[in-house]
From Swiss-Prot:
SMART domains: HOLI (SM00430). The modification Symmetric dimethylarginine is found at residue 57. This is Nuclear receptor subfamily 0 group B member 2. GO terms for biological process: animal organ regeneration; circadian regulation of gene expression; circadian rhythm; negative regulation of DNA-binding transcription factor activity; negative regulation of DNA-templated transcription; negative regulation of gene expression; negative regulation of transcription by RNA polymerase II; Notch signaling pathway. The keyword Repressor applies. It is found in: Cytoplasm; Nucleus. Detected in kidney, testis, heart and liver. PANTHER family: NUCLEAR RECEPTOR SUBFAMILY 0 GROUP B, NUCLEAR RECEPTOR SUBFAMILY 0 GROUP B MEMBER 2. Keywords: Biological rhythms, Cytoplasm, Methylation, Nucleus, Receptor, Repressor, Transcription, Transcription regulation. Pfam families: Hormone_recep. GO terms for cellular component: chromatin; cytoplasm; nucleoplasm; nucleus; protein-containing complex.
């Protein structure tokens, strides 16, 4: 049975016959720490780290989407009239899906290529033998996996296939923004009412196509729910860190909205 059929990662070799290099360089099973699954350097194709082919262009487009998101929030009186602390919490909880909707609305496309990963042997040979904790080099910045980026692209393509109009995008953003389930809200009941209003407005936009609009509404809401499963860390690692470094997007949005 092949490794792919048995569920064993091909890059790790057979479970009973590890590679010679792996045997020589690996400590005993009791002392070897488990690598986090999200950051393991698995050589399987779907888990290989990738990076943008055109980071400066894509990052510029991503920042433009953030700017349009801020403009959308500024022009939304129902959001601006909320307590500042509630605005901050809503931003922290929903900036990722709002940003993804902005990418979809602006039809932002991008390509990725495999990121170079130094071999274990190269790392060992280049490491200073007497380097302590103070002289150790900082770890390489995290890179998104191919599988995660492909899922993100699939979600964007699904939204493009729906061919949403500006009003549909606006009201859908409202249903995502006004999330009463965000912890720590002071006006959660009012925010729940705002979310319901945005949902009704979205239904009214689709009403001329009734009864076919019922299926369209279900598809729109289903696709919107998938956006919440895309990690904000992935968005930062892919679109922003390669050019502008480590940045807290929530704080950046707060600065742009003059909430800080």
């Amino acid at each position: 049975m092949s490794s792919s059929q048995s569920g064993v990662c091909p890059c790790q070799g057979s479970a009973s016959h590890p590679t010679i290099l792996y045997t020589l360089l690996s400590p005993g099973p009791r002392t070897r720490p488990m690598a986090p699954a999200s950051r393991s350097h698995c050589l399987c194709q779907q888990h290989r780290p990738v990076r943008l082919c055109a980071p400066h262009r894509t990052c510029r487009e991503a920042l433009d989407v953030l700017g349009k998101t801020v403009a959308f929030l500024r022009n939304l009186p129902s959001f601006c009239l909320l307590p500042h602390e509630d605005q901050r919490r809503l931003l922290e909880g929903c900036w990722g899906p709002l940003f993804l909707l902005g990418l979809a609305q602006d039809t932002v496309t991008f390509e990725v290529a495999e990121a170079p990963v130094p071999s274990i042997l190269k790392k060992i040979l280049l490491e200073e033998p007497n380097s302590g904790a103070q002289g150790a080099q900082p770890p390489d910045p995290p890179q998104p996996s191919l599988a995660a980026v492909q899922w993100l692209q699939h979600c964007l393509e699904s939204f493009w296939s729906l061919e949403l109009g500006p009003k549909e995008y606006a009201y859908l953003k409202g249903t995502i923004l006004f999330n009463p389930d965000v912890p720590g809200l002071h006006a959660s009941c009012h925010i729940a009412h705002l979310q319901q209003e945005a949902h009704w407005a979205l239904c009214e936009v689709l009403e001329p196509w009734y009864p076919a609009s019922q299926g369209r509404l279900a598809r729109i809401l289903l696709m919107a729910s998938t956006l919440k499963n895309i990690s904000c860390t992935l968005l930062v690692d892919l679109f922003f860190r390669p050019v502008i470094g480590d940045v807290d997007i929530t704080e950046l949005l707060e600065d742009m909205l003059l909430l800080r």
